[in-house]
Amino acid sequence: MKKRNRVFQKIENDYAEFKEEMTQLSPEEVFEYAYKIYSITEIYYILTNAYNYTSADVKTVLNFKGNFLEQVYQEWIDI
């Protein structure tokens, strides 16, 4: 499998993991996490549809331990 395909697979897996976590929450908790859910969904769509990956980006994503989408979200809100 090409590295770029592995990047997309990792992002797909991370998004599926995030969705699974969110579906386990109560309706009230989902409401509280609405902005995070929206933001991570948008990040997911950008990274899978509109982002042009450099070799360094590919390496960063593939070497990242943990949920890459949540990390991007966290870094974005910390700005």
Predicted features along the sequence, with ranges:
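Acidic interaction surfaces
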Residues: 1-79
